Amino acid sequence: MPNHSPSNDNAKFAIGQLIHHQLFDYRGVIADVDPVFQGSHSWYEQMARSRPTKDAPWYHVLVHDATHTTYVAEQNLAADPSADPIRHPLIKEVFDGFENGRYIARHRSN
């Protein structure tokens, strides 16, 4: 997952924040943020059925109780008020810990 976080001043959600997908009713944690849609046209046509805007932030999400990640438009997400940790096999690779209802991102070297 690319690290675009320095250019995401307009993003509503931050890396490490717990979210809830409003359409597909799952919990997850933000692993990375793209300031605008970075996927291919074919992926968008096949996967983004609700046709969310491409000109707003999109998020790489580790899905709770799953092994996959998702790529989600900001308009489909809401903050998850549960503050419960996420179970995902990549958690320890992406984050250093969990405090006060959010994950602490690992520092990435270039």
Residue ranges and their predicted role:
Residues 54-110:
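Intrinsically disordered, low-complexity, charged/polar segments
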Residues 1-18, 23-27, 34-37, 106-110:
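Mixed-charge, Lys/Arg-rich low-complexity intrinsically disordered regions
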Residues 27-29, 60:
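Generic detector of isolated residues embedded in canonical secondary-structure elements
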Residues 37-46:
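Short, solvent-exposed secondary-structure boundary/capping segments
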Residues 31-32, 41:
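Short, glycine/acidic-enriched capping/hinge loops at junctions between secondary-structure elements
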Residues 3, 12-17, 45, 79-82, ...:
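Generic preference for well-ordered secondary structure
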Residues 32-35, 65:
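A short beta-strand motif that forms part of the nucleic acid-binding face
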Residues 47-52:
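Short proline/glycine-enriched turn/loop segments at secondary-structure junctions
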